[in-house]
Amino acid sequence: MTRIDDTFARLSASGKKAFVSYIMAGDPDYATSLEVMRGLPAAGVDIIELGLPFTDPMADGSTIQLAGQRALDGGMTLDKTLQMVRDFRAGDDTTPIVLMGYYNPIYSRGVDRFLTDAREAGIDGLIVVDLPPEEDEELCIPAQAAGLNFIRLATPTTDDARLPAVLSNTSGFLYYVSITGITGAAAPQAADVAPEVARIKSATDIPVIVGFGITTSEAARTIAGVADGCVVGSAIVSRIAEGEPVADVLAFVKSLSDGAHAA
């Protein structure tokens, strides 16, 4: 059982949905990013997705791309991202952390070394958006052997023929991308999401978390209500980009988590 598994078990026992938030490590700078990260659990965040800055983030919309570029411009690296996790873990040993990014920085470091460092830093799971199931031997299988969850993405174009491959080695939760396209797109509609989540859940016991396009407390409540929870990224990152005080960013996150937890 990982921290992710424990979190879903606890939420399920209390009849609550999960609220997952995404921030980019090192955006707009290390200290501010860490301050936001440290405040997320008190703002109601159940699981933290921490973005690993990368030079070619092909699956991300402009909001996340710019956040990654700001982080890179500020000198953020994989080593510093792992250090941020260690700094967070010094005060929080319970909130799950999922590192989300692309395979190149991991490959460059070496898979075995990366997995050892990630586990020791306190990372619980990985989302690597450019590694399909056909390449599970690259990272997915070794990651799970190292005790990390490997979280896969599914989209509206993941049909019944493709779904078993997507689910085959997924653990922790499945991230359902509610809209085809890049991050930060238009708001998802519960009427569209509900049957897709039901279709996925008929094939797996893994929790299904829905993301992309959620910007309000009401949207968080509505979407979490037809899944096991929801994830918000671009809406939070946008506020960080605008230079909002950390307290205001966290107040916004609290409004979103309140919505999800009211589902």
Swiss-Prot record:
GO terms for cellular component: cytosol. It comes from the Bacteria. Pfam families: Trp_syntA (PF00290). Keywords: Amino-acid biosynthesis, Aromatic amino acid biosynthesis, Lyase, Tryptophan biosynthesis. Pathway: Amino-acid biosynthesis; L-tryptophan biosynthesis; L-tryptophan from chorismate: step 5/5. PROSITE patterns: TRP_SYNTHASE_ALPHA. It catalyses: (1S,2R)-1-C-(indol-3-yl)glycerol 3-phosphate + L-serine = D-glyceraldehyde 3-phosphate + L-tryptophan + H2O. The keyword Chaperone does not apply. The active site is at residues 49, 60. Its EC number is 4.2.1.20. One of its GO terms (molecular function) is tryptophan synthase activity. InterPro entries: Aldolase_TIM, RibuloseP-bd_barrel, Trp_synthase_alpha_AS, Trp_synthase_suA. The keyword Disulfide bond does not apply. Belongs to the TrpA family. The alpha subunit is responsible for the aldol cleavage of indoleglycerol phosphate to indole and glyceraldehyde 3-phosphate. Tetramer of two alpha and two beta chains. This is Tryptophan synthase alpha chain.
